[in-house]
Amino acid sequence: MDAASGILPDYAELFCRSNFSFLHGASSAEELVERAAKQGYRGIAITDECSLAGAPRMHVAAKAVGLPLVVGAYFGVTPDDAAPGHDPGPGAFGLVLLAQNREGYGNLSELISWRRMNAPKGTYRLTPRMLAAPPRALAHLRGVPDCFAILVPTYPARADVLDAQLAWFDALFGERARLGLVQLQRALDGAHREQVRAAGERRGMHIVALGDVTMHIRSCKPLQDTMTAIRLGMPIAECGHALAPNGEQHLRTRQRIAQLFPADALAQTCRMLDACHFSLDDLRYEYPHEIVPAGHTPTSYLAQETWAGARRRYPDGVPDTVRQRIEFELALIADLKYEPYFLTVYDIVKYARSKDILCQGRGSAANSVVCYCLGVTEVNPQQSTLLFERFLSRERGEPPDIDVDFEHQRREEVIQYLYEKYGHDRAALAAAVSTYRPRGALRETGKALGVDPMLVERVAKEHRWFDGSRDLLARFASVGLDPEVPLIRTWAEIAARLLNFPRHLSQHSGGFVVSRGKLTRLVPVENAAMEGRRVIQWDKDDLEALGLMKVDVLALGMLSALHRAFDMITAWRGPPLPDGRPFRLEHIPQDDEATYDMICRADTVGVFQIESRAQMSMLPRLRPRGYYDLVVQVSIVRPGPIQGGAVHPYLERRRIAAGEAHGEITYPSEALERVLERTLGIPIFQEQVMQIAIVAAGFTPGEADALRRAMAAWKRKGDLGKYHERIVAGMLERGYSREFAEQIFEQIKGFGEYGFPESHAASFAKLAYASSWLKRHEPAIFLAALLNSQPMGFYPPAQLVQDAKRHGVTVLPIDATKSGWEASLEAQPGAAPPDGRPAVRLGLSLVRGLGEEAARRIGAARAAGPFASVDELARRACLERRDLEALAAANAFATLAGNRRDALWQAVAAAPIDEAVRPALGAPTEADDVFADYRTIGLTLNRHPVALLRPALDARRLSSAAALRDRRNGRLARACGLVTARQMPGTAKGVLFVTLEDETGCVNVIVRPELLERQRRETLDSQLLAVSGVWQCESDVRHLVAQYLEDLTPLIAGLRTESREFH
């Protein structure tokens, strides 16, 4: 029947590109599925261009609404000079491939991988030869078996061209071949339809209706035009015929579709849909087999290694509680057949340890005693109230997630080990989806719309963030743009739509996928930007949704710094014990009073995890005095506890517990007391929220884990509501008040912002304490280790050096006659190892423009004897002129040539200069040296730049950081310093936190939203910022609440400083 009879024919859209066809598709998978379901489609296909990147999201969305999904891909096919019998004739055409079953999906995935790895980025077209005669290793892909193939003719179709193409197409694809008909309300649609109909009839090939969909609704057309312009690198006004002539490439109503297409072409869509039996749920991950030695099964080998590790962890005997826990975990792991996963991670960690690469597991894996015994994690589950179900349970239906951090400077060794062990065909990194950020969206959209480039740059520079088009229009108005002007309104609307849109695939920070067979038959693989690496087309969320294994091989800078510090301690002071083993983490004394005193003062610049502005503000209030306090400290300065209203109640209860405040710490029940006792009755961790659900609302452990997942997703999907009634009813049934039940639910919602797992915090707290101990007891070694581990951490080298100098560390300048590539330790006059405190000699790595190889040659030449002049150094180390100039500008020739200017002259001359002809060069001023230092090495050992300005700042009545420390609360105050950080946490409600540094320390500044809007340029662009406001000092937490800002950057014009922006 047709529309005329009153009954609409069924229809399935089989040609649909999402926004993972980058800069082609203008709608997300979720939007496309929702629209197709609303229109009553029988099903839908996802056919992104040479890609399956969007397939998992489409799968999840379609599954949620019960809409059948076909997985496929689209390819452009261009003619080639193939051998006779392979040439489809002149002209290009489109090819849609749809997987009919698991085998067809594997073939499609392998075809995509082949093209992606052997074509320039963005040019993934096929040729007839590739389809008909692929390389011998891929001969099984000839004709892409078990996939429907739809030829999409070039518009408008020509009979001779189409006949030639169909003859070739039919011979290659046979009964799987179909001829696609696209109708987009273009001028020649009637003629095109007739040509397609006639060609299909002559060839006896089924014709199938196609929508060539790139957007879910017509109103996305301006966004699609903008993306076309971005893709072509020209304004929309110059794109001409490259733009779609109308908005017909959307999911049209079935009434409209019935009017446009023949009934047989519509019926064919449903017949093909019904013939495609593949779902991404059919994918089955097979673990590698190399990890199990001969004579063992995965079960027996994991048990053997776990019990051996338990004996090492508990040399005085494995406690009964641990023994029972090991037996329980091993039984569950075996039942779920996850032993190969644990053994894969164990193998990676074993390799790293064999190469003396520092590593540590974190995240939910710290809940597992098996991981602890295997040496994957360092947190003893007995010492924390951890929850194994946060890591693994029967109800989860997917493998656990084990994250392992490695030294960031040596992680590549671990990655290459995986490639060598499993081969590039079986190992690849997970993808990360790079999306449009605020500035990029504004810039790209503005250029596409033809906005004046200078205006585009000014607006983008001043808008690091925005929240939707209304917010953006208001911000535009604040910088003098009229929101009523159509161009400005369009700019705001499209930029807001483009925000967070997928832009391209990059590589995940360390998620690795390894498989037993060819990975390309599980998921498409392509070359990563870094040579020697490959990346799959799915990200970590896709892998999780499909239950596929990922091993996180992550990089952590602090592990590099700790390892370097430990080695320096051993070299400087000798081994810590008579056995001669080097200093390591276990040799750091626990519960060191001096270390905790330093932490409580928030003296934590450079320390892991507790060095940020927010953490420093919390430290004097929470006052950690032990390891578990640090676990709480790491976790509490997070959106989850903040939004859940946990911070102030917890701090108040700490004061009550310490006898500093009146009150009583109570618990709603004995059962909840066991859950919340360690955090004084206030839920801080994700595990506690799960345990509350189990103990107080009757959830099973698996259901509690599902709640945790919903918590993590509710801001994005809003699906926490279904748990509200269950939690409240369960708590009422167990005797809790409705008020308390509602309070708990609100706290759970708060954790949806970002609740920190205790297992994660427990791992990080160990590193926080270790780095704090080093800063307190070995500050010079700690500084050298941090400098040699850059880039890492919160602070650039300039701030690390200034902080170390304030702590009495002697920092010696770069000297080509003494410095190595890295920072090193030297004895100070009158002090010697092992008891003396060393000085730090800065390394040549800081010199901008100097390569490591040149620095190594200097070191090798120096080892043969001292240098008498710059010329001799240049000759013996074979330095080029650019190397000499870089060293001279950095004042590295001071001991050979005097001041910087003389050194530069000698470097240019590259020979000793006769005193009679040497120009009379005046010595540079202190200010000259400071500016040159920042320009050439990024820091100075001379006076702080602000110290040089102190007379001028005093005249403006601007106080130093030191002078403000003792000012009374609520007094007016003025300060000035270099901007070293700007932060706006998601929980700050528009408040910006700015850190200023002067010669005496740092001032923390609070800039409220209204002031930020009034003085956006001063706030965001100043290098040297003066602030007038109200001084607040409470519980050793000090900050300046800004009322007026002044940009004094002209006073330091030309000074190159670094600041941490919005991290």
Swiss-Prot record:
Pfam families per record: DNA_pol3_alpha, DNA_pol3_finger, HHH_6, PHP
UniProt cross-references to InterPro entries, sorted A to Z: DNA_pol3_alpha_NTPase_dom, DNA_pol3_finger, DnaE2, DnaE2/DnaE/PolC, DNAPol_HHH, PHP_dom, Pol/His_phosphatase_N, Pol/histidinol_Pase-like
GO molecular function terms noted in the UniProt entry: 3'-5' exonuclease activity; DNA-directed DNA polymerase activity
Enzyme class of the recorded protein, top EC level: transferase
CDD domains (alphabetical): DnaE_OBF, PHP_PolIIIA_DnaE2
Location, primary (coarse class): cytoplasm
Gene Ontology BP terms: DNA repair; DNA replication
Keywords for this protein: Cytoplasm, DNA damage, DNA repair, DNA replication, DNA-directed DNA polymerase, Nucleotidyltransferase, Transferase
Cellular-component GO terms for this entry: cytoplasm
Protein localization: Cytoplasm
EC number(s) given by UniProt: 2.7.7.7
Family from the record: Belongs to the DNA polymerase type-C family. DnaE2 subfamily.
UniProt cross-references to PANTHER family, sorted A to Z: DNA POLYMERASE III SUBUNIT ALPHA, ERROR-PRONE DNA POLYMERASE
Protein name: Error-prone DNA polymerase
Species: Burkholderia mallei (strain ATCC 23344)
Taxonomic lineage: Bacteria, Pseudomonadati, Pseudomonadota, Betaproteobacteria, Burkholderiales
Gene that produces this protein: dnaE2
